[in-house]
């Protein structure tokens, strides 16, 4: 990395220009801090001796005369490239302006590459005496005249060439003006760019001093401005055009009382004395930075960008295509589904009701409205994708530019390359999906380029970065550091705001920071109030963003937005950490030099601080508890920040309390130690850096390093000092040895250890390590299960893993794997297969409804439990119920629970498990859910378990313990209602089907009545078991038994189960006056249905009649099968809708045909021009743009100019061939030369190949054709298309051709035809998928 000031050897020349006389008057050359002999040789000018010339040649190089000349030379490409006027100089091969001999002055003020044009104005002021508000600065870039602001009229740029001043013939007060400006003054807008462009490679600028015009005519001007109209003519026609720093009031003060300017407008006319003092201090400090930069870079460059000394914590990548792309963000939003992976989408577009924001989110999204209140400038879509619980945000604008952003932990230590790689990997699948949408997303063709494409520009912006200076300071040293920054504050390089925290120094770095959004200042909140009236708050648009120089409210807002980059310096035990916020990669490199030169000056050179203000290596030995803990967390946060991986984990300071934490050293620190000291260290591992680390235990009471296992969520071993040394052969010795070798201690290590060392069973109530066993609580073992087991068998609880990455309560998952004797991942794979079923929604008593499909649920199971990439917070509380159901389906295994929360043990069993327990065939597992975790119960023999972990986890009817479980379950299910079990016991009848609802409960049975019509018998919502009785998830059947058969069965049921007696309370009658059932008595009456009859059964004659205005079955059908049986009226409506919109579909095909006939002639002209142009010669480039303007418009010229500047001439032609220009869409004009009849015939010829003719149109659902594109290329399901042609009834085609011909020939309509034929039928009608929620907001 180079860091040097080119302006020292190629100085900036500032030439004064007098517009009144159209002449150059004086040149100032800013030499800066050059050697005295160079300064003396420069000032001799025409009297230079050969020796002087030799001095200048040695310092400035062979072209020293050119560098110190008075020629106008254009600079290199830079940021101010969006100007409306291309300047072509009439004379001079290299577009240099030859000036007569004028006075040359030499200034010792330095110019730096990081100077903005705002800084340059101040330096011109101290050198020339011309205050900033009187300076009109212009310069040349790429042969174009440019200024430091933009003037827009009704949104279009105004040409700003002060050299045309004398060409204006209308005068006010003796000054030439552009009178057209006054008549359109409300449409004028000034965008100040001084603060947003660096001087960089521009070495010659020109300044027109307003005083050269005003001073001679001050009396005449004073008289003229007394008239408001003349004042407006003068202000808007001259001042605002060329000197926009002046407000109307400031201009009036300049004319009437110029000596008051400094007092009234200090920002426009700062104190010259104060400014000179500040600039000289700035020059001293920046010169020092440049002088020491290369030395510091060489010293620290080796680790400047390494993982240990750099951490990007947030970043935004901007992808800018070099080709024109138009993307319909509204359609992308509509076609892109919300999923658990991409749970949130927001779009801003202009709908038929105005600016509109629409958001949608998956029902599992935790922050559904997070981005809907954002301020948008152009149509934009935002997609939020989650990977490993980390959010990645993709923002796509309608011009094809898109932004990718995310945040990371500092401990992840991402550098610039890994940030780009990570964000690219995130974006690629989404870009592919959008590109597959075809013309629905890209109405003018094209696609979004991937970040790896060559036809794009990639820039990293809005980064937050942490970097580390590998030295530390004492408290006094850090205080000294703070005090040394005061000079930088006085020089205006930094700005310090607010209160400072202990151990942190916070400031804004201002110098050289220019990558801001100039538009952010545009909207201002203007608050006005007065006596007797309330405060009035209005949002107004600034007309002139230079207002920050003459309006204190705007100045405060400006300072807030553009005040610099936030820098924080942290005083740490092991180093100095520096955080930089919202910076670009270019700014990072620049700021890094400034900061590290400053810090290095603290320890080297003549200004280094005293030794007692430096923290020495041996300070680690004497650190207090807090500082030791800080040192450990700073050097290896992945190891010592346990809550990074599990928010419930016990913190290290509790696990290893003072004075037991050890001291950590890096390899570099160890190398500088004496050999004797080195021998005392224990080599271990730095998990954050992935390199060895060394530990010592300096406290005399705790001199021996030990390693704690089982505490870290990732099974890392935690260093902690102990009183005694672990003895050979002991459990602690084995653990320490394993940790030092493998750095972790996992389940298999524990099993190996238990095999060697464990000889006892734990008492109940403690956390149970993996593969250890514990006794049951005494009230269960000694009372409930006392007679169900014989020695030497015992009941015990078996320890299993309790956490995994992303799931803090994974004990049930590991318990099920242990019970089924499966590897945990194998279990997850099998139940994921079972989850991918059409009836996924019944799982977990309806918890499956969270997901849009069984495939989505299965995918999430695999992501969470196999890949360990969990994204959903809700998943943490719902997976257990779903897993229990899936295990029951896959393995016919049901679980009962003993839940012990704070000492109260309760027996819990689900209704479906009760059904299984009460059945003859059962497989049951018993699980303990305690405060310490979830563990399976097993029957084993203690010695056998210690030897080979053999145990029984599944219990069947043959096991005595099942008698207890059966008895407890039977007691829990007796609640006064009948269920499936009772109905099955009616003699002479057989249950043939169970009906199941979406919450996985049985709600009715079909019973064989001995006829062809089964009896429909409702039951309370009941759990069920998978047995030989078929289940059905469909609607209530209509082919059922009549009343007589149904009542016969009910009578038998009432006789057998008097406690459940079914008593009718009301007769059910439908709207056809048919009797269809009855309602039973009770708080929760059930609906009994039978075959419809016109005759009221005698049994029910005395009951009231309840009319069903709509059968509940019809409601269920409308919910479950909304498209199965459309109403006849809907067919007619859909046909009418299709016919009414068929003209729009035809327009799409028409324009697609025309796009295929793009202007190849124009493209050929451009390619020929490229071949003939030598882009190394300015005259040739000038001729290129001149000829180009003959056949393309200004917007296309700017596009071509931008491509040339960003890609270079060699690659530009390839990019141009891919691009789409305005001239490609000048398509209708040739058709207007036809007569009406000729045009009709021509249109028929063009469009007939695109049409599939029909006698009559079939029914088409209007919802399917809301988004429409050409049938030729559509990637959508478009029912109006067949064989890639548009379906049109024969009798409509002629009419549409006639209408189209009339519209093309109508001068009032042809220009809007394209807009008529693009987009959607109803832009506020969106596809609503299951599990999606959509919100629409109007933005006014």
UniProtKB/Swiss-Prot annotation:
Main location: virion
Keywords: Transcription, Transcription regulation, Virion
Any one Gene Ontology cellular component term annotated for this protein: virion component
Location relative to the cell: Virion
Function: Putative initation factor.
Protein name: Early transcription factor large subunit homolog
Annotated source species: African swine fever virus (isolate Tick/Malawi/Lil 20-1/1983)
Upper taxonomic lineage: Viruses, Varidnaviria, Bamfordvirae, Nucleocytoviricota, Pokkesviricetes
